[in-house]
Design a protein with these regions (language model features):
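A glycine-rich, Thr/Ser-enriched phosphate-binding loop motif common to dinucleotide/cofactor-binding enzymes
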Residues: 22-32, 144-155, 206
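Glycine-rich phosphate-binding/hydrolytic loop that grips phosphoryl groups
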Residues: 150, 196-242
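Phosphate-binding/catalytic loop of phosphoryl-transfer enzymes
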Residues: 4-87
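Glycine-rich phosphate-binding loops at beta-strand->alpha-helix junctions
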Residues: 165-187
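Conserved ATP-utilizing enzyme core subdomain
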Residues: 66-153, 229, 233-242
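Phosphate/pyrophosphate-binding loops at sites that engage ATP/ADP/AMP, CoA/4′-phosphopantetheine
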Residues: 138, 157-167
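Generic structural signal for well-ordered alpha-helical scaffold segments
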Residues: 34-39, 150-161, 215
Length: 242
């Protein structure tokens, strides 16, 4: 309502409530936008978004879409950089690159039952906070960062995909972290590239996504599917003001 008052234009908001009320998890909401952008590209294609939480959109050769949150993304690394470096994030993955992964603690993190659940599934940014605090306690900051970066990558690599992708495209702030990108390249035996490689604007992608969802909302088209949020049926959503 405030945005409508300030801008004097119709505003679509509250994209998630209808999905949640119909039994869905309300996230992730980008998969249909990813599918629209990827029309004409060879499939299967995996689009990975690494924000505070990491999530993936799998676009099948048969036109199917599967999505889920894969695990923590940049969030724990950002928290670590703020705590030990006084910086909002680990620029260029420098802290993680200078450390060594603690394999035993990494395996403890990956023992969380979330990773055994099928897709679709979703997380909150703080879902792993307690476990991460335990797993990084007593580690040197660089080793903690290296371990958390490996945790992010392993969560993505263990995503329940129906088939191996031909290509992995990465969006979100994590695409600018060389440690995460190198980890993904090692985990997938296919090209792993930032979305700019196919002409997408990685910095604007999320804003573009919700503009696209707003138009779908105005047209009464679905914003989520049973295979993206777990909702019982394809679900539209959004609330128009103005």
């Amino acid at each position: 309502a405030l945005l409508h008052q300030l801008c004097k234009i119709p505003v679509v908001s509250d994209f998630r409530s209808a999905d949640v009320q119909a039994g869905g998890q309300g996230a992730p909401l980008a998969p249909l936008f990813h599918a629209a952008l990827a029309q004409g590209m060879p499939k299967p294609l995996l689009v990975v978004n690494i924000g505070g939480v990491a999530n993936m959109t799998f676009l099948g050769a048969d036109g199917g879409i599967l999505a889920c949150d894969t695990g923590p993304g940049n969030g724990p690394l950002d928290d670590l950089a703020q705590k030990f470096l006084g910086l909002p994030y680990d620029k260029d993955g420098a802290l993680a690159a200078s450390g060594t992964v603690d394999e035993a603690r990494l395996e403890a993190l990956l023992g969380h039952p979330y990773f055994a659940r099928p897709a679709p599934k979703s997380l909150d940014r703080l879902s792993f906070s307690g476990l991460i605090a335990q797993a990084t306690e007593g580690l040197a900051p660089a080793d903690a960062a290296a371990t958390l970066a490996a945790f992010c990558v392993a969560g993505i690599a263990r995503a329940p995909l129906p088939a191996p992708p031909l290509r992995v495209l990465v969006c979100g702030g994590g695409r600018k972290n060389p440690v995460l990108m190198a980890g993904l390249a090692a985990a997938f035996d296919v090209p792993v590239e930032p979305v700019e490689a196919v002409g997408w604007d990685g910095d604007a992608l999320e804003a573009q996504c919700f503009g696209y969802l707003a138009v779908r909302s105005l047209r009464g088209l679905p914003l989520s599917l049973p295979t993206t949020t777990g909702v019982a049926r394809a679900m539209t959503g959004g609330v128009l003001t103005g």
